[in-house]
From Swiss-Prot:
It is an enzyme of class 3 (hydrolase). GO terms for cellular component: extracellular region; host cell cytoplasm. This is Deubiquitinase SseL. It is found in: Secreted; Host cytoplasm. Its main location: secreted. Effector proteins function to alter host cell physiology and promote bacterial survival in host tissues. This protease targets the host cell ubiquitin pathway by acting as a deubiquitinase in infected host cells. Its EC number is 3.4.22.-. One of its GO terms (biological process) is proteolysis. Pfam families: ElaD-SseL-like_C, ElaD_SseL-like_N. It comes from Salmonella paratyphi B (strain ATCC BAA-1250 / SPB7). Belongs to the peptidase C79 family.
C-alpha cells in the first residue's frame, strides 16, 4: 500500500488518508498540488475528486484547478487538457443511474467551474449543449449582434455578451480602486438614434461625477471598444482603444460629441489607438477590453496612452500560437466571473 500510494501520488499513506478526513493536512495538500502543477494525471484525478466537496476546501481546490485550466496559474504545457478530461470523467460518473441523484455530485449538475471544464472537454454536441444549458440557463441577447446561444459557450470565436463583459470587468474593478467601470452599452440606440454614451455620461456626472479613471465599454454595432476618461495634469483626456479596423468618421464624431459632456473641448484631446489585434483572436474585441482594464488597473500613474500602445505593439509581435493561447485562456478567465 505504501509503495503504491507513493508511486501514484507521491504521498505517504498517512498523507493520502488525510485527504479523506474533515481536515486535510496542509502538507499533504501542498504536495498534491505540486504534483498536479507538474501534470501528474493521478494527482489531477485525485484533486478533482476533492473539488467535489461542498466545503471551503472543495471550493478552494476547484478554484485552483480552474486557475490552472485558464492559465491564470502556471502548470505543465498540457495541464488544461488533463484537467478537463478528469472533469469529464467525473461528469460521466455523476450522470449514471447510480449517482445522478447523489447530492455529493451537485457541482456537476449546476453551474460550476467543474461543470464548465467538463463541458469544454466533451466532443458530443448534444451533451455539450445540455451542459451549456445547465450553466447558462435562458439568456437573451440585448443586441442583434450578441451570440448568447448555448451551443457557442466554448467557441473560440464567440462575441462576448454585455452581461459576461460586465461580470468580468466589475470583478476586476473590485480588485482595483483605481478604475471605475460602467455597464457595457451600445453607442447609438437602434431606433431612437440617441447617443447612449452621452446619456450615460450625463447620468454618471449627475449622480457621482467622473472618477480620475472612468471606463465605458461601448459597442458600435458588432464591435466592443474601450473608452477611458482620465485626468492628466488636471486636464480631462479621452482615450479610445480599438482592436479592429479603424472606426468610420461618423462613429468617431459621435464619440467626440459625447466626450464634450465630460469636459473635453478640443477633438485632439480624444486619442484613438486603433490596431487590428484580432487576426488570431476572432471576435475578441471584448477580450481586449477586459485585458486592457487589467493593464490599466496595474499601471498606477503611468500614462494610459503609453500603456495601451505598448501592449498593442507587443501583442502584434507574438506568434500565432501565443495569440491563439491568449484567446483561449482569456475567454476562460472571463467566463469564470459568470460562474461565481
Amino acid at each position: 500500500m505504501n509503495i503504491c500510494v507513493n508511486s501514484l501520488y507521491r504521498l505517504s499513506t498517512p498523507q493520502f488518508h488525510s485527504l479523506y478526513s474533515e481536515d486535510v493536512s496542509d502538507e499533504a495538500l501542498a504536495l498534491l498540488i505540486g504534483e498536479v502543477e507538474n501534470g501528474n494525471q493521478n494527482c489531477i484525478d485525485l484533486l478533482c475528486n476533492l473539488a467535489l466537496r461542498n466545503d471551503d476546501l472543495g471550493h478552494k481546490v476547484e478554484k485552483l484547478l480552474f486557475d490552472l485550466f485558464s492559465g491564470k496559474r502556471s502548470g505543465s504545457p498540457d495541464i488544461d487538457k488533463k484537467i478537463n478530461q478528469a472533469c469529464l470523467v467525473l461528469h460521466q460518473i455523476a450522470n449514471n443511474d447510480i449517482t445522478k441523484d447523489n447530492t455529493e455530485w451537485k457541482k456537476l449538475h449546476a453551474p460550476s467551474r467543474l461543470l464548465y471544464m467538463a463541458g469544454s472537454a466533451t466532443t458530443d454536441l448534444s451533451k455539450k449543449i445540455g451542459i451549456a444549458h445547465k450553466i447558462m440557463g435562458d439568456q437573451f441577447a440585448q443586441t442583434d449582434q450578441e451570440q448568447v446561444g448555448v451551443e457557442n459557450l466554448w467557441c473560440g470565436a464567440r462575441m462576448l455578451s454585455s452581461d459576461e463583459l460586465a461580470a468580468a470587468t466589475q470583478g476586476l474593478v473590485q480588485e482595483s480602486p483605481l478604475l471605475s467601470v460602467n455597464y457595457p452599452i451600445g453607442l447609438i440606440h437602434p431606433t431612437t438614434k440617441e447617443n447612449i454614451l452621452s446619456t450615460q455620461l450625463l447620468e454618471k456626472i449627475a449622480q457621482s461625477g467622473l472618477s480620475h479613471n472612468e471606463v465605458f465599454l461601448v459597442n458600435t454595432g458588432d464591435h466592443w471598444l474601450l473608452c477611458l476618461f482620465y485626468k492628466l495634469a488636471e486636464k480631462i483626456k479621452c482615450l479610445i482603444f480599438n482592436t479592429y479596423y479603424d472606426l468610420n468618421e461618423n462613429t468617431k464624431q459621435e464619440i467626440i460629441e459625447a466626450a464634450k459632456i465630460a469636459g473635453i473641448s478640443e477633438s485632439d484631446e480624444v486619442n484613438f489607438i486603433e490596431m487590428n489585434l484580432q487576426n488570431n483572436v476572432p471576435n475578441g474585441c471584448g477580450l481586449f477590453c477586459y485585458h486592457t482594464i487589467q493593464l490599466l488597473s496595474n499601471a498606477g500613474q503611468n500614462d494610459p496612452v503609453t500603456t495601451l500602445r505598448e501592449f498593442a505593439e507587443k501583442f502584434l509581435t507574438l506568434s500565432v500560437e501565443e495569440q491563439a493561447l491568449f484567446n483561449t485562456q482569456t475567454r476562460r478567465q472571463i467566463y469564470e466571473y459568470s460562474l461565481q
